[in-house]
Amino acid sequence: MNGGKVKEILCDSAFQVKGKAASAMMSQMRKGFVYQNPDAAVGQARCHRFVGKDSNGFMPLATSLTRDDFFLTRVVGDFEDEILYHFDGSGEILETVSLGAKRMTYEQVLCPNDTLLLNNSYLLQQFSLRTHEVTPFANKKNSMKAMLDQSGDLTLWYTGEEIVVFDFGSNTEVWREAVKCKKSKDPNFAYYCFGMLSPRQSKAAYRVTEGEYVLVDLKSAQKVVIPNEGWHPFFSPDDQCFSVGGKFYLTQTGEEMDNPFPFSVQQGLSFSDTCAVRTRGSLMAVQQDRGSSPIELWDTGSGQLLATIDDPFVVRQVNFAFTKSSLVLHTDYGAMSIYSCAL
């Protein structure tokens, strides 16, 4: 790096060592250096690369559990442009696309029909991977309300009046329900407007009022109401349990149950606290406490903690998602990291 000279940096704590090592690596990465380790074991970094500081605090990613390539979006400078990056599974950039100025994508999902759905400041848009065309989708006017989630071939969104679950694999509508989102008194968000799909695509969950979540069976359209004012909902890998606000419920009946997970879940967390959970098969990636806390990789089948991922390029927050064989991270330091999860 520096002509073969060994440079000594004195540190008095492990935290300082991590910080110094990260800034030394980052200065190399800013010059275009890409760290790659194709033989990384489970939970080890396969790639770190600098993509650029992001003016977008959401750090969007779009992945699929059936493929290793993935998409990352970042806002450049003072909203001068928004750039979509397409990476392969080893972290090489396949292409970059300019989406245009004065945009901010909060979240994005990869659909099986070769499109991305983007939540651009509460407006849903469709991006074609073939033509690179961005077209309006679902809601035409910005009402400060949006839902967007994806699981398998299914995608869930909110039109402004209805929640829709659509199967892009077979091009069929699975479920649709008219709902009104209640205005919120919480300064962090304008409306109660949250929706998600379960890992095995048998259930959807949504929240449009203060004190309850509704679970929908996507085969029978039967509903179960969960009285809970908490945050950070997630399903178990087998769709049998729904957790929210640190409590656990049977999805079939809505009955409260004991924690079925090998990790504990904190109760009483607020909207802005951290509790992020991602699922791939029996694997669950869990981040709790703070946005800079390590991500734990659990195998719920065996109950084992497989790895703890403490990425050096997370300052305050990170977004992460599973691909077919990895966990990919988009960090607030402007880095993209890939960790091996090939079991």
Predicted regions and their residues:
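Short aromatic-glycine-(Arg/Gly/Cys) micro-motifs in beta-strand/loop hairpins
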Residues: 1-7
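A short, charged, amphipathic alpha-helix used as a generic interaction element across diverse proteins
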Residues: 12-30
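Intrinsically disordered, low-complexity acidic/Ser/Thr/Pro-rich linker and tail segments
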Residues: 21, 32-85
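Surface-exposed loop/turn elements that mediate protein-protein interactions on large endomembrane-trafficking
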Residues: 43-53, 82-99, 122-139, 163-185, ...
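Repeated scaffold domains used in trafficking and secretory/extracellular systems
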Residues: 55-67, 100-113, 139-153, 181-197, ...
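Short beta-strand elements that form the blades of beta-propeller/WD-repeat-like
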Residues: 68-78, 109, 114-119, 152-158, ...
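A generic tandem-repeat structural signature
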Residues: 105-168
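Blade-level signature of beta-propeller repeat domains, shared across WD40, Kelch, NHL, RCC1
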Residues: 315-343
